[in-house]
């Protein structure tokens, strides 16, 4: 699948800004966050992306929300292994620069959405879901090991993630959080939106010709 041309042009100009082993760095942040929260659970509140707290000088929150563990039990071991496969696939498919750009766009989108709608972000899950969506779009049949033994195709993981996020917002979230979610997905929209737009245009044209 071809990515938008502007991404390749950007890589030629500032490709040196890539972060090698970005996936490993993010997993390490999750490990550190897990250890900290495990020892002092109250610290988790200091890691949230809270717009009002950031404006009061707690700048670290712009980065530390990425380290908030998705769970506080042994399941994190399986999750870290799972994330390793996720980032490895994207790094092989895209290279370090595109993966770095995808991360930065999602990170900035999450921060902007949080500030615009004044919604605290207490999890890495919003950003993580966009990686599921990316792999499911690039190769929906790609399989990863879940719990070290169970092979699951990425299209089902992405679908499950999308359903969970939708249900959370539909039944428990406010409209501000829903819009914040869209901002968090800006990386996916910018990377794959043009492809879907071209596909829809060609499909509409084909159907008109067949009428």
Task: Annotate each language-model stretch with its function.
Residues 1-211:
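A detector for small-residue-rich transmembrane helices and their helix-helix packing motifs
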């Amino acid at each position: 699948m071809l990515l938008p041309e502007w991404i390749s042009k950007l890589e030629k100009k500032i490709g040196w800004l890539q972060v090698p082993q970005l996936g490993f760095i993010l997993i390490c942040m999750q490990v550190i966050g897990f250890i900290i929260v495990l020892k002092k659970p109250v610290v988790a509140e200091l890691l949230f992306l809270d717009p009002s707290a950031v404006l009061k000088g707690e700048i670290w929150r712009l980065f530390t929300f990425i380290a908030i563990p998705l769970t506080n039990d042994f399941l994190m071991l399986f999750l870290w292994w799972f994330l390793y496969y996720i980032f490895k696939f994207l790094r092989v498919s895209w290279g370090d620069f595109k993966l770095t750009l995808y991360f930065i766009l999602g990170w900035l989108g999450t921060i902007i959405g949080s500030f615009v709608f004044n919604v605290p972000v207490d999890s890495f899950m919003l950003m993580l879901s966009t990686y599921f969506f990316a792999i499911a779009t690039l190769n929906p049949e790609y399989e990863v090991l879940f719990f070290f033994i169970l092979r699951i195709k990425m299209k089902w993981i992405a679908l499950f993630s999308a359903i969970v996020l939708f249900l959370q917002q539909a039944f428990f979230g406010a409209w501000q959080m829903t819009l914040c979610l869209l901002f968090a997905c800006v990386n996916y929209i910018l990377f794959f939106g043009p492809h879907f737009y071209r596909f829809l245009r060609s499909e509409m044209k084909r159907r008109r010709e067949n009428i």
